[in-house]
Amino acid sequence: MITFPNAKINLGLNITEKRPDGYHNLETVFYPIPLEDALEITILNDSKQKFVLHQSGLEISGEPETNLVVKAYLLLEQEFQLPPVDIYLYKHIPSGAGLGGGSADAAFMLKLLNEKFNLHLADEKLEEYAAILGADCAFFIKNKPTFAEGIGNIFSPVDLSLKGYQLVLVKPDVFVSTRDAFSQIQPHYPDHSLKEIIRRPVSEWKNCMFNDFEKSVFPQYPVIEEIKKELYSKGAIYAAMSGSGSSVFGLFSPEEKITKMDFEAAFCFQTELK
């Protein structure tokens, strides 16, 4: 049984306050995009092992036990005594890009196990399991445009469709640590919530919807800022960094026919949103 975990982009990201536990509260809008990994599971005949992880595509660092798809399997295996499985993961979503690739893989693994082994878990229960694995994992259970607050784990639906818009996503060959991204952040409450801004026409977003991480990331990694500028120079009506980086995306008008774009030494994904 196979499934295709998809990435997300952040539309706006406001860091609103630092919490007593050291984390930060924020508000953002998660929007699913059709950049996908591939994830398949089959029954493992060798019952001496609980799982075997087969990885291909983009390189993933770390031991198999640290991979979120494995953690998702072990979470439900412990609860429901699942049989051993072969896990095949093909990575197309870049890691460390602010695209939620690992979280998507984990959430889709929960959904895949639920279907394959007839666990009859409702979405709400799957979201509870997903939240154990990561703050934004639960978003990928329903996988619809969502306003997120808290530490990115409190969700409410957003009535938003970008159907027809052209998306160009670029990830340079740099890694942004979360610590670096937070290093220059001054938490603040914006004058207008993203819940309000997201209802405005996309053509107005450039001047009112921002990613707070850009203030600290751009000075440290100028190549990321240059990509954003280049997307605007090529005609994007809105461009921003996703999450804490290092990917940047541009939205182009449905009426504009754009050609294949190339960015030197960078991963580039281009599609029409459905």
UniProtKB/Swiss-Prot annotation:
Coiled coil: none annotated. Keywords: ATP-binding, Isoprene biosynthesis, Kinase, Nucleotide-binding, Transferase. Belongs to the GHMP kinase family. IspE subfamily. It holds the Pfam family GHMP_kinases_C. ATP binds at residues 94-104. The active site is at 8, 136. Its EC number is 2.7.1.148. It catalyses: 4-CDP-2-C-methyl-D-erythritol + ATP = 4-CDP-2-C-methyl-D-erythritol 2-phosphate + ADP + H(+). One of its GO terms (molecular function) is 4-(cytidine 5'-diphospho)-2-C-methyl-D-erythritol kinase activity. Catalyzes the phosphorylation of the position 2 hydroxy group of 4-diphosphocytidyl-2C-methyl-D-erythritol. Pathway: Isoprenoid biosynthesis; isopentenyl diphosphate biosynthesis via DXP pathway; isopentenyl diphosphate from 1-deoxy-D-xylulose 5-phosphate: step 3/6. It is an enzyme of class 2 (transferase). This is 4-diphosphocytidyl-2-C-methyl-D-erythritol kinase. GO terms for biological process: isopentenyl diphosphate biosynthetic process, methylerythritol 4-phosphate pathway; terpenoid biosynthetic process. It comes from Bacteroides fragilis (strain YCH46). The lineage of its organism: Bacteria, Pseudomonadati, Bacteroidota, Bacteroidia, Bacteroidales.
